[in-house]
Amino acid sequence: ARKIGNEIFLFLKDKHHLPINREKSGIRRPVNFTILGFGFVPTYKKGEKGKYQLVVSEKGWKNLKQKIKTITRKTTPFTFDERIHKLKEVQQGWLQYYRIASIQEKLKDVDGWVRNRLRCCIWKQWKKPERRRKNLLRLGVDLEHSYSYSRSRMGTWAVACSPILRTTITVERLQKRGYESLLIYYQKVAPFLNEPLYTRTVRTVV
């Protein structure tokens, strides 16, 4: 492996005059290798030993979450529509770059986290207990629960993650305000999910 690696290095350097960074070049297992924000993991499919699929590196996920945190920080003076607009720009730009990676399951977790952050912003925006009570009533909560929920002593994040807001500020209601999940947009742009049917392997559905 080292001999082949050196031959490739010399070929690229001498024949094509390409600059090669020795520190970033090396011989290593795919699972220990990242490049341009991508990593590799085994496919774990029967009959596919030695095959790997492309995923997003930990640094790539960290960068995305940091940008989302900035936009959805409850103290940032954005209107809800402004947050949604900026959130779309960040999510779509990130997914356009990483669309070739296999990340569907991970996106589901991130989507849930993003929605809770949006609920947190909404709860913070309502501020006073009486305003919260009236808004909960508008969302279909009964009189008794709207009063007790609006005066909950739980923290903002705890309320956002609880049934108080998860059953009232639903995914459908967020979508009506312009929200689009990472998973839905990924399913639109991921090339291996949008190939013509005749190019895909036929699978038996049971």
Question: Which sequence ranges carry the predicted segments?
Answer:
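Non-catalytic terminal/accessory segments
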Residues: 1-206
